[in-house]
Amino acid sequence: MTTMKRSADPEAEEDPDPSLGKFIEQVVSGPTQKGFPASGAFATPRARRSRGPKRFLGKRNYRRARARKPGKRDRAHSSKVRSSDGSTRPSARYGMRFRSPTLPLCSRPRTWEFLLDLGYDSMSLKSARVASERPCDPGRANHVWEPGGLSPEQAQWDWVGKVYSRDRVLKLMGELHELVYRESGRR
């Protein structure tokens, strides 16, 4: 209730701040700023460093807020990374986002040694069409690199018309394993 007394009698001796009563009356009477007392925090304006011209402040902030939708920034300026085969693709962070709806089998480069250690044989590799040497690019067909430098077409005709029994297939797989381990030991 002391506040009401002060606002009623602002010139009293016990009042520590005589302008407080006027200030309260001003706030209660309405939102006009004409008769604000020049005391305390209202005496000097807030010191704010200027960050350049403030001409288009509202419009610019509105535009920037609109442009900050998810999925805009990485599509607009994704850093171009040139891979070993010369193709440019989006940066590694957003690489797979706009590629294909399903993640392809060859989303990372896999070598023959890696796949053979996992237990694949060359027929299943050929049927799955897993790229071994080069990273995946959905624009082209990912053919398997055949050992011996055969092109995929030659390797494809290699299988035609040949009926392999099971022990012959196992023997071929053993030879392929030996070749792979010899090559990997050479590095």
UniProtKB/Swiss-Prot annotation:
Keywords: Mitochondrion. One of its GO terms (cellular component) is mitochondrion. It comes from the Eukaryota. Residues 1-95 are annotated as: Disordered. It is found in: Mitochondrion. Residues 46-80 have a biased composition (Basic residues). A stretch of 270 kb of the mitochondrial genome is duplicated within the centromere of chromosome 2 resulting in the duplication of the gene. The expression of this duplicated gene (At2g07682) is demonstrated. This is Uncharacterized mitochondrial protein AtMg00880.
